[in-house]
């Protein structure tokens, strides 16, 4: 099923994955959860703004999750827009919209891609269990559509550690570059 699903969407030239990663096992975080959520939103919004053509417009649509988490994410996004950022979000809707994944192929795609990335990272960082299926799907469907620098670098472009941490980045670089 997953391969059939991905085969239908991977031919879209605009398909691009950006993952923000927090390594909760090795990265102590002294920030409140709402601040970490804001960092995740900020990383994604900055990259979306950078990649949007001057005459283009982007909207972030995410899974409904649970109502408390959605409220936290929307509040984080609102604070990011109100408090400002070094990037001016001229081509990105200043909020997030939610949709039920069972009613949206785009949200299903994001859900599957996140699950695949989770399996790929678990295999390489935790070495528990058999993640062959996830790593095969990662190589076949996610890797070709990861946001990259012109020189092919993925970490820092399509995969961002949140909060920024050079030691985590050093762990991620061999997995993606």
What are these regions (language model features)?
Residues 1-177:
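Phosphate-ester processing/binding pockets and catalytic centers
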